[in-house]
Amino acid sequence: MDDDDELLLNFAAPDTSSVAASKNQNVKVSGGRWKDRRKLQLALQGRTKKRQPETGVNLIPVDESKRKRDSEDKVQLDSNKRSKFTESKGENGGKGDSYVSSLFTNNQPTSHLAPTSTTKELTYLPSNAPMKDATNFSGLGLNEKLSIHLTDHLRFMHPTKIQQLVIPSLISTENDLFVKAQTGSGKTLAFVLPIFHKLMRENKFKINRESGLFAIILTPTRELATQIYGVLETLTRCHHWIVPGIVIGGEKKKSEKARLRKGCNILVATPGRLADHLENTKTLDISQLRWLVLDEGDKLMELGFEDTIAQITAKIDSNSKIADTAEKWQGLPSRRINMLCSATLHSNVKKLGSIVLKDPEMISVETASVAGTVSFDETIATTTSTAPDQLIQNVVVVPPKLRLVTLDALLLKISKHSAERTIVFFSCSDSVDFHFDVFTRDGKKFKKVTDEETGEVKTVLVSPEDDENDGLLTAPQLSDNTIIYKLHGSLSQQTRASTLQSFVKDNNSYNKILFCTDVASRGLDLPNVANVIEYDPPFTIDDHLHRIGRSARLGNEGNATLFLLPGIEEGYVDGKLRVAHPREGNLRVKNYEKILQEGFAQGNIKSKDNKLGKWDIHATTWHLDVERWLLEDQASHDEAVRAFTSHIRAYATHLSSEREFFNVKLLHLGHLAKSFGLRETPKKLGKSVGNNSNYSESKKGKKEDPRKKMLRMAKMAVKSASSEFNY
């Protein structure tokens, strides 16, 4: 049989598409939208849906102008929709096609603080006002000539409560004193008047500048020293033989040495400069010193003057010759009287008291006086410091992106009133400079010129380049009758003094706004300050009390506003503020949107247009103007970067006891940079600062984390703040 039986077998070969589909059935598709993944999966499995032929109206040709836009047209449409946020398209956008974030989106809402209802408003009697139903100054034991000068020339009709307690004690006894009183209660006159009274009573040998130095008053800041010196000069008008003097950092030591050689009876000084003169000025004779007064003792310790004050007291003790001249100056104390004034009684103040005071008597408005003497080595019952009863404290919780525009709205509202004085506190000098430039764009300076025909001295407005004073400018961004001043420790002493003098000077036709750091928060008696704004939160609750103490002084009314961020900072209200503001109704929470609406609404606030959101368009336009100004001016942009980084460094220096409310790690740095008009990312801003920093070459090799760098520089700032010449 033949092997080949011609049997044919037919095998059907599988279709290539089905083989591919079977291989791809188990292929997992990932990424993209679900709809796209599903379509791809079906295609791999060979289950593509057959497209139905178009019928009906879809076959009718459409005019080109009415044609539905395809995907490319849609992209173009989206680009046009964002035209107002791009610098190259539209008038309100970013430069170089950069995207500008919106002010009113992605803002963190407030967690639990609700705006306070204003239906029930309580008013309280002033807690630091002069006692009108009490005795006059002559009744406190002051001599008649000095009392008449106070009432007739200085218009001080009645003493305050702290003056009623301190003046008789300093006149009748020779005990050391610790005085604790609210800020703005009249502590300066409380210790100055008894010293003048004693010096004026010395009749046997009339005291003049050649008699010697009898009193030294130490202050933590130059501004406070200058103010006390001004008070002494007004008192000398009733007794010209008493000569005051002043030595402070920032002045020429050669001029101070010349004044000390001529002689003075009462010397006001900052600790660093006084210690320098005690070592190097031989003509400064402290052998007859009868009074040593330390004003704002808590701030003296906070600035690190403990060792300096210890050196000063040791020098005074070693050179004292009071016993040798006791018979000559019989009307003066037979021993040196030390006095410490402070608004708080913390451990650092107690430590300073143990260094300076010996068996002191404690005088406080809350507790009158402590019988006998008080030992600072023992535990003293501390009373919580509080704000004046007549002061209204407002709290505004503002998202970080809206901080700058909310400040502008608040200042716009204030500038619409009659002439008022307002103080705005910032955390650092770089922030003061930046915000000063923002609000004084296109502003002018005041310059005194003499009329050639009449010889009359007039004040005229000139361009900023025509005058050397950099401390003030008009603010056309707010109103035509508003002047903004700036004050911080980095300015020259001449600028600081002239700025403060101009701000205090009466001028009823202008609103005056002072941008400053905490250098203006201690002891300064700035008259008629109606509003205090804490744009940056205080570093301690004591700093808060001193800041708001610039308003509501000597029984006058006052308003204060504190800016906080949403989140943990809201806990600062219940954790700290309610203790400092115990009066019901004095602590109020305000809605930032109402402030924006009042500041940027045009016409009637309650009109339909403003309710529909016109005000937020005006607010956005104003903020974008600031951003474009920074993009066009490189110097101003660099200043904004410095202000932002300095603000973060300052924020990191809050005390550990208040770190639960102010944690730098929880800040939204991008949103915060927006409030400085910056469009770069915080990482890029950190790099720009790093390029200008003075690192060693070894450290430049490794890239430093921006957050660690800010914390490191914050520690450096705290360390350098202990020097009075940097304050």
UniProtKB/Swiss-Prot annotation:
- Could you name the Gene Ontology cellular component terms for this entry? nucleolus; nucleus
Q: Where primarily located?
A: nucleus
Query: What biological processes does GO assign it?
Result: endonucleolytic cleavage in ITS1 upstream of 5.8S rRNA from tricistronic rRNA transcript (SSU-rRNA, 5.8S rRNA, LSU-rRNA); ribosome biogenesis
Record remark on domains: The Q motif is unique to and characteristic of the DEAD box family of RNA helicases and controls ATP binding and hydrolysis.
PANTHER family linked to this entry: RNA HELICASE
Family affiliation: Belongs to the DEAD box helicase family. DDX31/DBP7 subfamily.
Protein name, entry field: ATP-dependent RNA helicase DBP7
Which gene underlies this protein?
DBP7
